[in-house]
Amino acid sequence: MGLCKCPKRLVTNQFCFEHRVNVCEHCMVQSHPKCIVQSYLQWLRDSDYISNCNLCGTSLEQGECVRLVCYHVFHWDCLNARQAALPANTAPRGHQCPGCSVEIFPNTNLVSPVADALKNYLAQVNWGRNGLGLALLSEDQSSSLKAIKSKASVSQAAVSNMTKVHHIHSGGERERGKPNGGDASTPHSVLLMDAFNPPSSGDFNASSRRPLLPRQSPIGGTDRDDNKYQRRTPAALLSRWTRRFYSPSSRPPWRRTWFLVLSGILAFVMFIYLLAWMGRSGSNDGLDESWNNPNPQPNHYE
């Protein structure tokens, strides 16, 4: 079990073999759509992986990929062609993962970002809609979906190419403007938004509540995951304990105030007790012993 490093901070046992980090299902869909993800125990047994599609043998980076509920990744075109070649009367349980023979169609009561993304792909083809219990698409509708999908992929590729050209061109202008005593244009940033997947109101609300910079505790440090098993020296433990007094904390302020007050009272009582003990030990000198002796011995002088 591990903690995902995304803002959701979910506990997960899935591990990305390529980036070597714990990932939750939200990160699988958003940040690791083409990565090899399996359990952390599987990675401990064998960390070797091949980032190729098991159906065609080519790299997963060369096409659109889909992740099944068993977390295996395939090219969508390869998986669609394989499952479409099955008979039309194939039961939903007959559509299985080529790698582990797990049913492709997720359960209806499964709440999972990976399952939701898979359902979006399955809803585009008739064999997928048949397994999901949806109405079948006509030939015109399926052809229009394919045309829209191809246009979307072409436009996204063109936007990415234009972005690269723009960065190269702007970088060249800045390099030419430096010898003349300053930059030719002021630095700026370009915000590209997907025209086919506009952000919803929920995304705006979520982004408005997200802090600009993640708050890092100065006590644990930035390399908390790297040295969490390192042996702490007494100096490091003392420094960590003293830094808690001025570090920002999520606890109520009255707890810290009461802790300081009780610590001061305890220190004052210990100081008074120490002074009293030292006073009693200093009063037991030889003069007091002679006056309190019941059988004094007189001194004889010759």
Curated annotation (Swiss-Prot):
Record's compositionally biased regions (Polar residues): 198-208
ZnF bounds (B box-type): 1-43
Residue stretches spanning the membrane: 258-278
Coiled coil residues, start to end: none
UniProt cross-references to InterPro entries, sorted A to Z: ZFPL1 (IPR039043), Znf_RING (IPR001841), Znf_RING/FYVE/PHD (IPR013083)
Topology term for the membrane: Single-pass membrane protein
Residues bearing the modification Phosphoserine: 217
Positions of RING-type zinc fingers: 53-101
GO cellular component, one term: membrane
The organism's place on the tree of life at top rank: Eukaryota
Protein family membership: Belongs to the ZFPL1 family.
Name of this chain's protein: Zinc finger protein-like 1 homolog
UniProt source species: Drosophila pseudoobscura pseudoobscura
